[in-house]
Every structure is written in structure tokens, then in C-alpha cells.
């Protein structure tokens, strides 16, 4: 199995409801290590840049408005098959379709306010991590 890194964002809805610790605990219980994290209030430019691939889609404006509505917690997670493991912990994008016990089933209220973001591939993870973190901000854990 491959050790990978993935980007995780606890979105404004989950931050405002104080779910950060519970969400982090689920990552750690699943064997994912938090190797970088920061709380940040995204600017419009930050959100537009991060979600640029969705610029032509109808939901883009609402997504940017939501992601800039309050602080987020951006993290790099590391572990075996981290991208897939993280996405399984998050559950389906639409919380109504998310399996019980997943983050979105437990903490999200709608497909628009769905508690968290996770990279969808190793290539996306590399791009997304670089968007928020310099190499020297990531602390590999050896113990």
C-alpha cells in the first residue's frame, strides 16, 4: 500500500458548529496523520483560485460565497492510501446519500454545506496541498 498525502478542508459550517476536534479524531482513528494544519478565512481570490476548475458551473458563485463566509481549517493528512481513506471517512458529497457514521452524514446539512472537502485523486491532492502549504510547512511524522 502506498503512503500518500491528501488535502482536507473543514468547511465554514462545521467550523462554526465546533466540529473540528471530532472530525480530526475520526481522521486519526482511521490511521491518517495530520502533518500540517492551519485555520484561515479564505478571501474571494483564495476560494476562486482553489475552485477554479468549477468556474463555468452554475454553483461556482454560491460555492465561493459559502467558502468565504467564515473560517476553514485546511490540513494535510498522510497515510496509506490517504486519498481514498479520507474520502471514505467523509462520505458521499450529498449528505443525504452519505453512509451513517461518515462525517457528512453526521455533520453536514446539505450538499452545499457539506462539512468538509477532500482531494479526489493523488494528482489533485498534490495540486491542492501546494495551493495552501509550502513544503517547509509540512511536518512528516516519524513517531
Curated annotation (Swiss-Prot):
Enzyme Commission number(s) from the entry: 2.7.4.6
Cellular-component GO terms for this entry: cytoplasm
GO biological process: CTP biosynthetic process; GTP biosynthetic process; UTP biosynthetic process
CDD domains with a match to the protein in the record: NDPk_I
Subcellular location: Cytoplasm
Names of required cofactors: Mg(2+)
Pathway noted in the entry: Purine metabolism
InterPro entries hit by this protein: NDK-like_dom, NDK-like_dom_sf, Nucleoside_diP_kinase, Nucleoside_diP_kinase_AS
Binding-site list for ATP: 11, 59, 87, 93, 104, 114
Record family assignment: Belongs to the NDK family.
UniProt function note: Major role in the synthesis of nucleoside triphosphates other than ATP. The ATP gamma phosphate is transferred to the NDP beta phosphate via a ping-pong mechanism, using a phosphorylated active-site intermediate.
Name of the featured protein: Nucleoside diphosphate kinase
Organism, scientific name: Acinetobacter baumannii (strain SDF)
Gene: ndk
Amino acid at each position: 500500500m502506498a503512503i500518500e498525502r491528501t488535502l482536507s478542508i473543514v468547511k465554514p459550517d462545521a467550523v462554526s458548529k465546533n466540529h473540528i476536534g471530532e472530525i480530526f479524531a475520526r481522521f486519526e482513528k482511521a490511521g491518517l496523520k495530520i502533518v500540517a494544519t492551519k485555520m484561515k478565512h479564505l478571501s474571494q481570490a483564495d476560494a476562486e483560485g482553489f475552485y477554479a476548475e468549477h468556474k463555468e458551473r452554475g454553483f461556482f458563485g454560491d460555492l465561493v460565497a459559502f467558502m468565504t463566509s467564515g473560517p476553514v481549517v485546511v490540513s494535510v493528512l498522510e497515510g496509506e492510501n490517504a486519498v481514498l481513506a479520507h474520502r471514505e471517512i467523509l462520505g458521499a458529497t450529498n449528505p443525504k446519500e452519505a453512509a451513517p457514521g461518515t462525517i457528512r452524514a453526521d455533520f453536514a446539512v446539505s450538499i452545499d454545506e457539506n462539512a468538509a472537502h477532500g482531494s479526489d485523486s493523488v494528482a489533485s491532492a498534490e495540486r491542492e496541498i501546494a495551493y495552501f502549504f509550502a513544503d517547509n510547512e509540512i511536518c512528516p511524522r516519524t513517531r
